[in-house]
Amino acid sequence: KNFSDVYPDKFTNVTNGVTPRRFIKLANPRLSDVITEGLGTDKWLSDLELLKGLIPLADDDEFVKKFAAVKQANKVDFSNFAKRKYGFDIDPNTMINTMVKRLHEYKRQALKILSVIADYADIKSGKVSADDIMPRTIVFGAKAAPGYYLAKQTIQLINNVARVINNDPDVKGKLNVYFPWNYNIELAMNLIPATDLDEQISQAGKEASGTGNMK
């Protein structure tokens, strides 16, 4: 702060951001093509204000069909990637519900897995019929600091819950949980384009930037 007071012109604040060139053009070329077709230009890649031109297309049935087809194709691609890379059997016809972010108490991955446990318990107790729920696949992606014991315990909990749920025939095809290891850019570029529902439930006032949802 002292240096900033003396040399204010030498300091600037740049928050976290997301590059559309990587997370749309490179990671999601199908969506990129649909956007370019809808806008009639690819200049949106360097001027995201142009994306406002998509708003009227939300009521265009043909555009919506193309958008939905892109999402389904991406889900199939991710399912194949997950099988090849991790041995996971992910059904691309289920809703893919993701929570990808640094593992931390304030980001509340523990709260999310507790909600999954509650849903599972409701099905097993007969309180809710498995046939009445939206078939969903929950995918966690995260890393924890080496010495962060509670975060490591949360990862263990998620994997233990996944092991139970994924091997229970009562919820087969209705509820599945996966935690692919070593979350990295390769996984992000395959998972994010396939995501139907992205969870952002960090404790209010704690999230510094929150770029995961932008991707």
Where are these regions (language model features)?
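Catalytic cores of carbohydrate-active enzymes across secretory and cytosolic contexts
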Residues: 1-215
